[in-house]
């Protein structure tokens, strides 16, 4: 089964994302910030990470930078899901190692398309 880790400080976004992902056949886990997300990845590397930008403790950019610097071959696809919608943020995310970028709010179809673009859904 495909696995996805949702890293977002919003309980509502995690709930909505979980519902969409489960209908697409993903087993879903959650983290409230980048630090929890990194810990979850080290315990069990997911296939995909849905990642928020602005979170307490550790931001999405800090998360992806540390994740991509870790040794080893297992690296998940990372889709930023954020309200940061300017070109500078998109470039920064892609440069840091993001595979896709989707603006909040998003719907089922948009998320499904983004997941297809990174090889899932």
Where are these regions (language model features)?
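C-terminal output helix
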Residues: 106-115
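Active-site beta3 strand of CheY-like receiver
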Residues: 44-50
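Short amphipathic alpha-helix used as the core "switch/output" element in two-component signaling
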Residues: 39, 61-74
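Receiver (REC) domain active-site loop signature in two-component systems and cognate sites
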Residues: 55
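Helix N-cap/capping motif at the beta->alpha junctions
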Residues: 30-39, 60
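Charged docking surfaces used in two-component/phosphorelay signaling
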Residues: 15-23
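Alpha4 helix (beta4-alpha4-beta5 surface) of REC/receiver domains from two-component response regulators
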Residues: 62, 85-100, 110
């Amino acid at each position: 089964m495909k696995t996805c880790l949702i890293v977002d400080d919003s309980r509502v976004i995690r709930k909505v994302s979980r519902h969409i992902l489960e209908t697409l056949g993903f087993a879903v886990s959650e983290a409230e910030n980048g630090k929890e997300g990194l810990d979850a990845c080290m315990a069990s590397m997911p296939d995909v990470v849905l990642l928020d930008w602005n979170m307490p403790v550790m931001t999405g950019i800090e998360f992806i930078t540390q994740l991509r610097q870790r040794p080893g071959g297992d690296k998940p696809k990372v889709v930023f899901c954020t309200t940061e919608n300017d070109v500078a943020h998109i470039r920064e995310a892609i440069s840091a190692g993001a595979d896709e970028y989707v603006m909040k709010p998003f719907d089922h179809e948009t998320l499904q398309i983004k997941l297809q673009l990174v090889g899932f859904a």
